[in-house]
A protein has these predicted regions:
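Receiver (REC) domain switch/output surface
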Residues: 117-129
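Active-site beta3 strand of CheY-like receiver
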Residues: 47-58
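Conserved acidic segment of CheY-like receiver
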Residues: 2-23, 34-41, 51-52
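C-terminal single-pass membrane-anchor helix
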Residues: 134-166
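Short amphipathic alpha-helix used as the core "switch/output" element in two-component signaling
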Residues: 63-81
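Short, conserved "switch-loop" micro-motifs in signal-transduction and mechanochemical regulators
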Residues: 90-91
Length: 166
């Protein structure tokens, strides 16, 4: 597994620290950064995050700050290659659906099982990436084989036309 750079963006410092501790214990090769606002997250994109764990609200520190949903929309417009896992205290299906529609890979409800669910979301994400990688590899192989077959057919036609084969 490549070294992942993970941003945890959560305005609840205790929850962010617990999330960092949990992820660091499960994935010791991850480089993890914590931010309390979407703006801080955006200001640190030069660290090239591969995954962002993003709180839905983000309004405890600064009421005028960008919400988690607004941050998600901004990230997906500007950095579509970054995978985002949303976390929220809201156990509402419409909120989860909205986040996924806006580009979140998964949605985790804060609570007793949040850390395990986040870990499961990471594992699902890694499997998804592997499938995407395999698909790209097979598409490339398919193109190569297609061009090889076309080349063989063209050579056979040339050989027939020149009388090399009957």
């Amino acid at each position: 597994m490549n070294k992942e750079v993970v941003f945890i963006v959560d305005d609840e410092p205790m929850h962010a620290q617990m999330m960092e501790d949990h992820l660091a214990s499960k994935y010791p090769n991850f480089k993890i950064y914590k931010y309390s606002t979407g703006e801080e997250c955006n200001d640190n994109m030069d660290k090239h995050p591969t995954i962002v764990v993003l709180d839905y609200h983000l309004d405890a520190v600064n009421k005028s700050a960008r919400t988690g949903l607004e941050t998600l929309i901004h990230l997906k417009k500007k950095y579509d290659h970054i995978d985002v896992i949303m976390i929220s205290g809201q156990d509402k299906i419409d909120v989860a659906v909205e986040c996924v529609r806006e580009g979140a890979f998964d949605y985790v409800v804060k609570g007793p099982s949040a850390f395990v669910r986040t870990e499961q979301a990471f594992e699902k994400l890694f499997k998804h990436r592997q499938v995407i990688h395999e698909l790209a590899k097979y598409k490339k192989l398919n193109r190569t084989l297609t061009f090889s077959i076309i080349g063989i057919i063209a050579l056979a036609a040339i050989f027939r036309a020149t009388g090399i084969i009957g």
